[in-house]
Amino acid sequence: MSNQRIRIRLKSFDHRLIDQSSQEIVETAKRTGAQVCGPIPMPTRIERFNVLTSPHVNKDARDQYEIRTYKRLIDIVQPTDKTVDALMKLDLAAGVDVQIALG
């Protein structure tokens, strides 16, 4: 496992949850003796929606909503067997989407 790399991508709508989860992952990886790069903040995706408030007239009256998607990237450069076991047992928040890629 010494020449492999683990890339972890996190997505969330809440920036506090994603920062807390990324901190847990980094602490777990460092505790098991792996070298960690990150968390790297990726660009925030902002989706905006405009909705008419009136069903008939008053085109100028609109409500505006937005959804922000926060992303973080963590690279574990030299993972050990303990690192992989600890990451599998790690319990993260429900609002965070985790994608793990071995490379």
Curated annotation (Swiss-Prot):
The keyword Calcium does not apply. GO terms for cellular component: ribonucleoprotein complex; ribosome. It comes from Acinetobacter baylyi (strain ATCC 33305 / BD413 / ADP1). The lineage of its organism: Bacteria, Pseudomonadati, Pseudomonadota, Gammaproteobacteria, Moraxellales. Disulfide bonds: none annotated. InterPro entries: Ribosomal_uS10, Ribosomal_uS10_CS, Ribosomal_uS10_dom, Ribosomal_uS10_dom_sf. Belongs to the universal ribosomal protein uS10 family. PROSITE patterns: RIBOSOMAL_S10 (PS00361). Involved in the binding of tRNA to the ribosomes. GO terms for biological process: translation. Part of the 30S ribosomal subunit. One of its GO terms (molecular function) is structural constituent of ribosome. Keywords: Ribonucleoprotein, Ribosomal protein. This is Small ribosomal subunit protein uS10. Gene3D superfamilies: Ribosomal protein S10 domain. The keyword Ribosomal protein applies.
